């Protein structure tokens, strides 16, 4: 087992970017957390540790619905959802037309419950943003969520909502969607869970999305349509235009590291990372993707078979400044495969797309479909 070569490869990736860049995002004052009164009592909640019990919303079967006028959490603050153990999904919308600024902790005390947070006006996560949720987390700027059995949870026109016991089946967009930005934050879900960002343009700047042995979904769209998370796909339907994904990593900013135990110990994480026992899946959909120095890892540890990375970009993709995508394997299982489609794919300045084995397991396949492909890995 060549553990040293695996960890050296990850650390080599960290140091490969040679060109620094800077980005400044203002984090303005905000209105805190208010309920809009459409599902329960309306009014401002007391901070800085906002408590959101079930009776402020409406429970239908395993779905607990909440409706907020504003939802922003400042540095050092928290918002804690609570309710009975019968809740499977906490589904919150923001209707007031203001961007949600999250620089504190979003928490749930309901065991295993998934969290949906919907704000059509936009979402910005700061460098202190964290998640403390035992289920999956889905963040979106969609106008509505389509539920099974004819249900609908509408943030654009709340009166159109039809609340049902059925799970969420689609994220629906009516207007050109607002962006989602993660500026320096570390957003993590527990092992085997899903972390989704589904909205307009998506920007990750020195940020880390981590779903160990789980799944990450990113869909960036630019018009009306629906995004459907399926078991083995992330379908985008009815869109005239798709949006832009930007991943930027300043090489002077230290990466988040995690201790995954022996034999690997402490390893640095990618900007998108589902690595773990058996690996995890990553689905990316959009109109274009610029990756400057970012890492996308779905590496497999142990004896279980890995899962795949599936990227479908309608337009141009540019990997630059040491950007990297891998489904490497350290163990006896089979590594995940990479399926990557784009109109134009440019891999530049030390960047790469790889699947490699560092142990007895077999590496997965890499399939690239592009009308134009340029590979120039010489560092500039």
Residue locations for each model-derived region?
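Extracellular and secretory-pathway beta-repeat/beta-biased strand scaffolds
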Residues: 2-380
């Amino acid at each position: 087992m060549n553990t040293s070569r695996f960890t050296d490869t990850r650390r080599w990736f960290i140091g490969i970017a040679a060109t620094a860049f800077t980005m400044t995002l203002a984090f303005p004052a905000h209105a805190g957390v208010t309920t809009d009164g459409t599902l329960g009592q309306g009014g401002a909640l007391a901070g800085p540790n906002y408590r959101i019990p079930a009776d402020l919303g409406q429970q239908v079967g395993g779905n607990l619905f909440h409706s907020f006028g504003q939802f922003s959490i400042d540095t050092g603050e928290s918002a804690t959802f609570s309710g009975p153990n019968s809740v499977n999904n906490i589904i919150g919308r923001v209707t007031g037309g203001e961007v949600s600024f999250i620089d504190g902790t979003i928490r749930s005390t309901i065991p295993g419950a998934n969290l949906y947070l919907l704000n059509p006006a936009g979402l910005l996560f700061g460098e202190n943003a964290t998640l403390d949720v035992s289920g999956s987390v889905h963040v979106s700027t969609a106008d509505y969520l389509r539920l099974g059995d004819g249900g609908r949870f509408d943030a654009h026109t709340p009166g159109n909502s039809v609340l049902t016991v059925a799970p969420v089946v689609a994220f629906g967009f009516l207007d050109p969607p607002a962006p989602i930005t993660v500026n320096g934050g570390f957003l993590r879900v527990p092992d085997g869970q899903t972390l989704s960002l589904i909205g307009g343009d998506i920007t990750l700047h020195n940020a880390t999305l981590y779903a160990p042995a789980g799944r990450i979904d990113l869909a960036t769209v630019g018009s009306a349509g629906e995004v459907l998370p399926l078991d083995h796909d992330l379908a985008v339907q009815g869109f005239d235009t798709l949006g832009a994904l930007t991943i930027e990593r300043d090489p002077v900013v230290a990466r988040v590291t995690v201790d995954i135990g022996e034999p690997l110990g402490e390893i640095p994480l990618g900007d998108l990372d589902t690595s773990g026992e058996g690996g995890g899946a990553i689905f990316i959909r959009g109109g274009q993707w610029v990756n400057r120095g970012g890492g996308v890892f779905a590496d497999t540890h142990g004896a279980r078979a890995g899962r795949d990375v599936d990227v479908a970009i309608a337009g141009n993709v540019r990997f630059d400044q040491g950007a990297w995508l891998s489904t490497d394997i350290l163990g006896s299982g089979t590594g995940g495969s990479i399926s990557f489609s784009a109109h134009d794919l440019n891999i530049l300045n030390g960047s790469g797309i790889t699947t490699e084995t560092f142990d007895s397991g077999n590496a997965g396949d890499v399939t690239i479909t592009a009308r134009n492909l340029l590979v120039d890995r010489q560092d500039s």
